[in-house]
Amino acid sequence: MGCPRSWSGPRRSFWPGEPPPSRRQATGRDGRAGRGPLERVPVIYNAALVIRSDIQFPPEHAALREDVHALGELIGEILREQGGQPLFDLVELDRRAAIARREGDEQARLELAASVRDRPPELARDLVRAFSMWFRTVNLAENVHRVRRRREYFRSTDHPQPGGVRSAIAQLKSTGVALEETLSLIGGLRIEPVFAAHALPATRRTLLRKQQRVAERLLRLGPGLTAQESGRLWNGIRFELTTAWQTEDVPRTQLSVGDEREQILFHLVEILYRVVPAFYEEISQAIGEIYSVPADSIDLPCIVRFGSWVGGDMDSNPDVHAKTIRETFARQQQLILNAYFEECQRLAERLSQSEERASISVKLTQRIEDYMRLAPGARAATPARRERMPYRLFLMQLAKRLRYTYEGRANGYDDARQFRDDVQLIAESLLAGKGEHAGLFHIRRLLRRIDTFGFHLASLDVRQHAAVLHRIISQGGDDPAWPDRTGAERTRLLADALNKDAGPRVELDALGKRNLAVFETFAQIRHRYGPRAVGYFIVSGAKGPDDVLAALLLARWASVYDKNTNQVTLDIAPQFESLAALESSGEILRALLAEPAYRRHIEARNLCQGVLIGYSDSNKEAGPCASRLAIHQAQTALAETIGSTGYRYAIMHVRGGSTARGGGRIDAVLKSAPAGAVNGVLRLREQGETIKQGYGLRPLAMRTLERAFNALSLAMAERNAPATPAAHLECAATLAEASREAYRRLVYGEHEFHDFFRAVTPIDVIERMQVGSRTVHRQEGSGLAGLLPVPWVFAWTQTRHMLPGWYGAGAGIAAAIERHGASRLREAYAQWHFLRNLVNDIEAMLARADLEIASAYNVLVPEGMRHFAETIRAEYERTREQVLWLKDATELLDGDPMLQRAIRLRNPYIDPMNLMQVDLLARWRAGDCADRGLFEALLASLTGIAQGLQSTA
C-alpha cells in the first residue's frame, strides 16, 4: 500500500469532518442575552443538537483534519482486513447513527439503541476496540499536531511563545529584573515531576512504543517528500496500527509492580533523557538573546530532577516491600547506565580527533594512562590508530567502566560523581584545545544528564498509611490501648520514646518486620545508588503530629540514623488528604515543629520540611469546590507556619488526571496558589493519562517543562504580590460551604446512594479489573468511605456523569450570589485567578458530561432509587445555568473553542460504546457476573471510553 489516497474501497471512514448521510431536523439556536443571575437557562445537554457540518475548523488546524481523515481511511482498511466487511459495516452503522442522533434524528436514536442490544460478546468487544483504536490514533494525531503548531509558531514569528522559557525571561526583563537577579531567581527553582502508576487501565508499554513510532512517521510526513517516501511512511504506520489491533489492550493477568514500573521508565529513558539538555539550552539561549550576553557564559544549576512512586508506594498495595524497592533501583540503574554506555559509544565514534591535530590536556592524558593500568592487557588490545585518538580511546574506556558497573564487576564506578569527573575532563580538554565546536556541545549534554539522573535515574518516594505505622507502634511497643489513645497522648509518648531512643519492647510481628525491612533498605540504597536516590518517606492519611513521629520512631527502630549526629537520615513528609486534615494542616505542622525531638531531626535534614497535599480524598468527601478551597487555604497555612520557624518547605501536589483529582496544566497550579505560598519548589505527582499527554512525545515533554519553568519563575518574581482581598475569600467560603452541603446531601445523605452508585456505574467491573497492583478499597474501610478516590472518579467518568468534577457548584454559586451579591461574585471571578480557574475547570467538566447518555444507565437502577438520577440532573441544570451566567456565555466552552469543538466531534464516537456498555452490564449482572466473554467486552468498553474522553481519573 502507498499513501491513503491510493487505497481502494469505500471512502466513508472514521474521521470527524465529513457530513453524515443522515436525516437532519431543523433546529433553532438559543439566543440568550442579558439575563439575570438567577434566571432559568434553557438546558441543552451535550447530546443535543449539533450539526456536524456547522463545526468549523480554523485554517491552522487544517493539517490535523487531513491527518485524522487519512488515518480514519487507514483504520477502515485495517478493520476490513482484520475483522471482515461485516465488522466494518457495523462500525459504520453505529457511527452514522450516532452522528445523526446528535443532529436530532429521532429515528437514528431508536435505531442505535436497538442495534447495540444483545450483540455477542466477541462482536461487542471488537466494535469497542475499533472505536478505541480510532481514538488512540486521533489522540496521537492531536499530539503530533501540537508539535507541528509549535514548530510553525517559531518559524512564523520572532515573538516568544506564550507560556515558554523565552516568554518568562522577556517578562522578567521587561519588569526591570536585572541579569544577576534573573540568574539568582533561576538558581532557586526546583522542578520535580513525580510519576506514579495508575490503579486503572494504562496503555501497555508495547503499545506506547508503537504509538511513538506512528508519531515519528506522522511528523516526517510533509509536502517535501516523494510519493514513494510518503508511501513507505504510511506503510510503516499501517504496520504499527495493524499489530496494535492484534495486541491485547488489557493484559489477561494482573499487572505487577514491575509492569507498572516499566511504563514509567519508558517516559524517563525514552523521552526525558533526550529532552533535559535541550531544556537547559533553551534557558541559556533565551537569557543570552534577551540580556545580550553570550549564552555559553551562562552556568545554570540543576533545577529539574524526577521522582517516582512506582515500586515504593505501600499504601493499599501489599505487593510493595523492601524487595520491590531494591528491584526498582536495580532496574532504574540498569537503564540509566545503559543510556550512558550507548551515549559514550556514540560520542567515541564522533570525537575522532588525533593527538597530532588536536591539543589534549595533560590531566586527560594521565587519566587515560591510569585506566590502561587498571585493565591489564588493555594496551595490547587497543588498535594503534585508536591510541592516537585520545577522546575516542577515553570514551571507550568510560563505556567499559560503565559496563563493569552494570555487571557489578571490579573497576566499575563507585558512584555517578566519578563518572562525571571523567566526562568533565573531556569538556575541559576540548574547551582548552579549540574543541568548542568539535564535541564540547555533546559532552556538555552528557554532563547535564549525569547531573539530572545520576546513577539512580529518579528518586523513589516510599509511602505508607499512618494507620499501618500506628499498628506497628502498638504491637512493638506492647501497647494494645494505642489505637484508642488521643493524638495528643500518642504525640507525647512518641516524643518521649524518641528522646530516650527507646526500641521495641517485644519482637515485631510479620507486618512490623516487613515495614522495618523497608526502612533498613534505605541505607543500602543510598550507599549503592547515591544520596538522591531515596526521596521522601510519605505518611499518607496524616491527621496529627503523632503520624509523623511514628514514622520517625520506626526509622530509629530500624537504625536508619547517622552514627555521628545520631539523627535519622530520612526526609519524612505528611500527606494531608481529608478535608479535616487539610483545614488543620497548619496547626498540625505547628505542633510537630514544636517538638524538640522533631526539630533536631529537621535541623539535621537541611532545615527543610516536605508536605504533600492531596486532591482526591477531599474531593470525594466534600465535592470539588470545598476541596479546592481547602487546598488553597492549606497552602497559605503551611507556608506561614513553616516559614515562621525559619525552616524551608516543599509542598507537593498529589493530583490525578481529572480535574476532580487536581488534574490540569502545570501552570494553573501555580497561578492559583495563594500569594506567598510559592517558594521556588514545584513538585507535582503525575499519574495516568497526564503522563502520556504531558510527556508522551519529546516536544510535548519539552513544552511541559517550559510551562513549569514559565509559571514558577514568574510566580517567584511576583511572590510579594498583594494578598487576596477578604471580600473574594468570603465569596469563596460561602460558595464552598454551600456546595459541600449539596454534595454531601446527595452522596452521604441517604444510605441508598451507595447502592445507586453501584447500580448506575460499572464499579463492579472496575473492582474486578486485573490491571493494577493496588487495591480498589482501603483495607480499613467499607462502602463509599472505603472506596479509593480513583475508582470513584473513574466510575462516574465512564457513565459520562463526571459527577465528582462539578456536583454542588451550582448550589455554591447561587448561595454566593444570594449572600454577597452578583456584582461582588463577578468581581471576584474577574480578579482572582483561583476562582476563575475553579469555575473554568467546572465548566470543562460540565461540557464533558453528557446527562442524556448518562440517563441510559438508569435502566440498570431499581425503580426505587431513580430519584437520585433526577437530583443529579437538576443540579447539573442549575450548575450549568450559574456557570454560564458567571462567565457571561451562551454555551459551555465558548471561551475555549478548540476544546468545545473536540468534545462535539468526539461525542458521536463515544456514544455507541456507552450504549453497548449499558447492555453488556445488564446481561453480565443478570448472569451473576460469571460470563467471561461479557466481562472481557466490558473491559474493552472501559478502555475505549477512557480513550475517547482522554480521561480515567
Feature locations, PLM:
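Ligand-binding clefts of soluble mixed alpha/beta catalytic domains
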Residues: 643-644, 684-819, 953
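C-terminal accessory/interaction regions of large nucleic acid-associated machines
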Residues: 757-953
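Hydrophobic cores of alpha-helical transmembrane segments in multi-pass integral membrane proteins
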Residues: 76, 635-643, 873, 877-883
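Often metal-dependent polyanion-binding catalytic scaffolds in large enzymes
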Residues: 45-494, 509-514, 570, 663, ...
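Active-site cores of enzymes that catalyze phosphoryl transfer or operate on phosphate-rich substrates
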Residues: 391, 400-404, 455-461, 465-549, ...
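Carbohydrate-active enzymes and regulators
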Residues: 93, 106-107, 141-145, 160, ...
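Compositionally biased, low-complexity flexible segments
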Residues: 1-42
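Catalytic or ion-translocation cores adjacent to nucleophile or general acid/base/metal-coordination motifs
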Residues: 320-351, 557-741
